[in-house]
Amino acid sequence: MSDVMRPIKFKHLLRWMLDEYASQKSIFSIPEGKFYYKKDKAYFEIFGEKCETAIGPAAGPATQQAMNLAVSYLTGGRFFELKTVQILDALEVEKPCIDIPDEGYNTEWSTEFSVPEAFDEYVKGWFLVHILDKMLGISQLDERGFVFNMSVGYDLEGIKTPKIDNFIEGLKDASETEIFQECVRDLKAAIESGEIPNISDAAFADSISPKISNSITLSTMHGTPPDEQEGICRYLIGEKKVHTFVKLNPTLLGYDYVRNVFDQQEFDHIEMNPESFEHDMKYDDAVKMIASLKAFGKENGVQFGVKLTNTLAVINDGRRLPTGE
């Protein structure tokens, strides 16, 4: 199995999806019987957008490829936290880096794609989800009922670089990007050739909004001081004008509480380093930061919130994964 992840052109993804559905009644290996069809028009609003269900995949391997976003939609996901991008997008990551015996472990925080490649994947996924909704009649709403949420990291200096800034601005409005225009062209060609069931008007391709995401979930490194986290959030809210969530870690609860929870739930084999809790943000500091940023978000006309929970640093036994933590 190759450890190099190579992007697939949108037209090839579309052909794969259509051929598999026609021949096997499955899409990206998900059988039709497992597709989730919304049976009513109920939804909630977040970031000024409609969202049909309160579930979806968190940032990670499950959201870094276009076909994974399509699969998540097919199985009921409607809020998609896209995998985190950062300025260091060409790191050599020792493999394997993920292990899920029951609870999940990972030893890396990079992406397998460069930032421009990740951007392209998210645009392709955006189109695939729109196509599936229209083709299969999955939603009962007359307008979009799902939300794409960016995730960026890990410090202000990196987030301000042209590479990450272009990523953010591109997902806010992708209309002028090469990949968005390519997807429109390829989708129109497929519609005009009669390849897509239940979609016959090529104008459908033009109806897909280029405004893919107006929100960001911020990811920072363990041990990042509260004032630095708040500074990044203020930049995203005040300068980028995006709805902002920040990921907070279980270390806020303190070592003794987390240890007790693990032991009570029979996860006593998980080992933690108490020093990890000493270096991370404290609960009282988090409360102050949240109050400050909620007020700042209101001043700027955007929402601020937190994601609970992000990752927890644990001691690696070294049996299956590299690195010590």
PLM feature spans:
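Active-site entrance/lid segments in N-terminal catalytic domains of soluble metabolic enzymes
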Residues: 2-12, 16-34, 38-39, 59-61, ...
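Short, intrinsically disordered, charge-balanced linker/junction segments flanking boundaries
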Residues: 321-325
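N-terminal amphipathic alpha-helix/helix-capping segment at the start of soluble metabolic enzymes
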Residues: 36-56
